[in-house]
Curated annotation (Swiss-Prot):
Keywords: Ribonucleoprotein, Ribosomal protein, RNA-binding, rRNA-binding. One of its GO terms (cellular component) is cytosolic large ribosomal subunit. The gene is rplY. Pfam families: Ribosomal_L25p, Ribosomal_TL5_C. This is Large ribosomal subunit protein bL25. Belongs to the bacterial ribosomal protein bL25 family. CTC subfamily. Coiled coil: none annotated. The lineage of its organism: Bacteria, Pseudomonadati, Pseudomonadota, Alphaproteobacteria, Sphingomonadales. Residues 201-212 have a biased composition (Acidic residues).
Amino acid sequence: MSDQLTLTAETRERGGKGASRELRRNGRVPAVVYGGKEEPLMIHVEEKLLMKQLMTGHFMNSVVMIEVGGKQIRTLPKDVAFHPVKDRPIHADFLRIAKDATVQVAVPVVFQNEEKSPGLKRGGVLNIVRHELELVCDADNIPDEIAIDVTGFDIGDSIHISNVTLPKGVESAITDRDFTIATIVAPSALKSSDGDTTKDEGEDAAEGGDEA
């Protein structure tokens, strides 16, 4: 389960591009807290602290307690916008959540036991279709990552959501199909060799036809 994080914030009186630019010049990131049947709350947070939490790797699927005005607001990060050139955060959105809330989050996947995959041992390539899974779970039970065991998978095999064992209390947000997460594909050298073989066989057949 992801650790709970804390962000100290201050309220901001003005919105708009001019006010936001001024905040960024002072090392602050404008943000908004919304949801929970309450009015949106405009805040700003320290850029360095936000960057530090983003670098944990699980910020977007962690409960973040925002401390502002002497109280704490329980939230889930929903979006962080970055400057297209400087790669610095320029805005953040947070969703208010109740303590017993059920949330939908994107959780990264990791692949295990690659040395036990016949396809990968033969030089196959793990083609990842989904780097994250959309999951539904309690806010206090968000996984850091989902481990996927590739033991026994061969070249040409696909790994579907039905092949994945999710933690207790965690479900896939997509329930209408058995979607693909990854496939094991043949290496380029093997594909090329197969193609040459097919080509040779075709030429042989054509020559045989001429002789007839």
